[in-house]
UniProtKB/Swiss-Prot annotation:
The lineage of its organism: Bacteria, Bacillati, Cyanobacteriota, Cyanophyceae, Synechococcales. One of its GO terms (biological process) is translation. GO terms for molecular function: structural constituent of ribosome. It comes from Prochlorococcus marinus (strain SARG / CCMP1375 / SS120). The keyword Ribosomal protein applies. It comes from the Bacteria. This protein is located at the 30S-50S ribosomal subunit interface and may play a role in the structure and function of the aminoacyl-tRNA binding site. This is Large ribosomal subunit protein bL19. One of its GO terms (cellular component) is cytosolic large ribosomal subunit. Belongs to the bacterial ribosomal protein bL19 family.
Length: 160
């Protein structure tokens, strides 16, 4: 009976061969896989879109918040000339994120409220400069549309 047990258990040499063969198998599979390179890596559609959007975003966009008074430089082309026209007002809304991020800027021009929606990463937006920080407790300031005169002012924030 002891001889049967001895015959069924592998000898030291056989066990070393088994260990070496089991070690060799994963290495062989690792070597056959292609190296990770940008040209050969296959991305999912969602990852590909995210990568494209990231490449199209502007690098230096200031951190703006709802309630801030900003000056947006808008590129205007007249004929073959191009100039930058400033548009200053209060941000009353921010929407979306990433490449499609928009801000709605409101100002009073000749007694009439004018709102413009700017895509932050658009080539038509030359610059965004924060003139003063606003202290508000709402994500959207649509209530400013109903206010007139001094009631449309936003308190200034000094900590940002």
């Amino acid at each position: 009976m002891t001889e049967d047990l001895k015959n069924t258990s592998p000898s030291k040499e056989e066990s070393n061969e088994i260990e070496e063969s089991s070690k060799a198998t994963p290495k062989a599979t690792r070597e056959t896989k292609p190296k990770d390179s940008p040209s050969k890596t296959k991305l999912s559609a969602q990852a590909l879109i995210a990568q494209f959007e990231k490449s199209q975003q502007k690098k230096k966009v200031p951190e703006v918040y709802v309630g801030d008074t900003v000056r947006v430089g808008v590129r205007i082309s007249e004929g073959n000339k191009e100039r930058v026209q400033p548009y200053e007002g209060v941000i009353i809304a921010k929407r979306h994120g990433g490449l499609n991020q928009t801000i709605t800027v409101r100002r009073i021009f000749q007694g009439v409220g004018v709102e413009r929606v700017f895509m932050v990463h658009s080539p038509q937006v030359a610059s965004i400069k924060v003139e003063r920080r606003g202290k508000v407790r709402r994500a959207k300031l649509f209530y400013l549309r109903d206010r007139v005169g001094k009631a449309t002012r936003v308190k200034q924030r000094f900590d940002r």
